[in-house]
Amino acid sequence: MSSNLYSIGLSGLQSSNARINTTGQNTSNVDTEGYSRQRTDTTSSPVGGVVLRDTSRLVDNFVSSQVRSDTSTFSYYDTYHSMISTSDSLLAEDSISLNTYINNSFDALQTVNNDPTSSSLRQLAHSSLNNLVQQYHTLSGVVSDQEGLVDAQLASSLGDLNTITAKISNLNEQILRQEGISISPANELRDQQELLAKDLSKYLDIKAQFNDKGLMTIQLANGQPLVMDQFPTELKVSSNPLHPKKIDLVVSFGDYEVGLKTQGLGGSVGGLIDYRSEFSVYADRTLGQHAIALADAMNTQNRKGLDADGQFGKDLFSLGDINVYSTADNLNKAKDISVRVSAGQSAKITKDTYELNRTDDNLFSIKKVNAEGKSTDKAITFDPSLLQKDNNGYFKIDELGLDIRLDGIDKIDKDDIFQFTPTEGAAAALGLASRNGEAIALSAPIGVSTGSDNLSDARISLTSVTNTDPETSAFSSDGSLYPSAPHKIYFTSPSSYVVQNSSGVELAKVENVIEFSNLLEKAGLSNEAGFDVSVSSMPKRGDEFSVGTDNIGQSDNFNGLALADLQNQSLIDGKATLVKSFSGFISYVGSKTAEIEGHADSSEIVMNESIARRDRLSAVSLDEEAVNLLKYQQSYSASAQVVTAARTTFETLLGIMR
């Protein structure tokens, strides 16, 4: 009996000692990040006493998984918000607001219209346009600087991420070795591994699981592996010839690489990539669409007037080249494809990417795809051999507002894919083509006069100038009207008139006129002429009105007023003015920032609650450990008394035997 009592007391001592050690371990690691409270389990022995079992970690894998998921979500929105809030504060700053520079430029045009002969006012208007161009560059620089910051942060994050996965893999090896030579679990190593997994979730949305050996494996939310037992993978940035500005990721397995879907990555890496692909691309293309619309509208209108030297106006702005991309094996073919915005057709240009490919021997197709790669419209199919080319080899795709030149058309094979985005980088490439204010075409290219012998008070006025191209209008290359063009309007009655050329030959006759605006349109001649005229009231029989290029005054501001009025025209996508479009863009940035900020705040609350749930189970409580320590100390003392009693009993028995 005494020997049994001795065994019971000894096992109690061992049990109490082990639990005191566990309590001491918990207490000493109260501030250790990632440490999970440990507990030494025991069971009653069938022969008496207590049997020590494992010292295990108090963890709930479901709660730990939730902590990682919520950490990833918060990190995603926090990173996204930090980037977009910077963009919001910069783009919305009044001192660099594009609308301020737009208003200043058009105000300067209005001012010079008051005195078109003033060189100083012309130069002031030219300086305002130059400032506007520089502001496009500034705003584009804000976007590109943020893109550079994303690239730098992403490179750093991937380096840290790959280091973490390597450490997790290394810990798997250590755990396998340590638990193979011991009956106790490698608690501290597993705590380190859990902490690394939590750190990893700050970068990506991951799933941590344990295989049949009890080793941690890491997968992305889409199922792609990052850690397989003792074999880590590596995440890398990969170049994409079709989308050079797009961030592509690959998972390297050492001997081969697999492309990674970048949607829904979560964590800070997902936040950086989504900011770049969603907001940064959108901002760059929005500014580019804005710049294209401004340049095209101003250039088109300036070509309809005469500059200070009496010459037809030329382009005020210049646009950069539109880059054409293709797959790596087709890069040489892409160099033979040129694309530009058709003159006067910028309203048709969208922020989409355009995909060109050859469908068969003769036909090509172009379709528009959005930033997500989804088609946004029906594909346009055309046969280049049937389209008329200009002197530079370009043919028009009217539906898209684009001119295309295919120099190496015979080299292009069926199903070759080429992509280009007209608005990409267009704001950064915008330039001022005119050298000074004298290039601003304020005057109309044609004058009108009312016959001195007319019997009525009706006065003729120039209504519009729509085309000055010598090949398609009444204007010759030297600026004069072709002799065959409309030169005179003669009223045969108050309600009928004829249009005559310079030789008096009748070009058209119109009768039953009750409204006297756009007389050439009524005669069916306005499109060919490229201009139109109106009279102020009902003429009388015999009234004559003339048009020609010798009736232009130096102070004429007809085209200058049209240039200034572009501020009020719906130039962006044919739906919004320049100012309204940029204001809408700033509103979008503000609302997007507020939306992301709301998600960041709410996800932080959810994450903190998950961490608190984990801590309630796994974190060390000094109060609880103090109670346990007192209890185990008392248990140790009691077990020692049992051993003492067993020894006393044994000695008493020996004494009796003597």
Residue ranges of model-derived segments:
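S/T-rich, low-complexity, solvent-exposed segments of bacterial secretion/appendage proteins
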Residues: 1-658
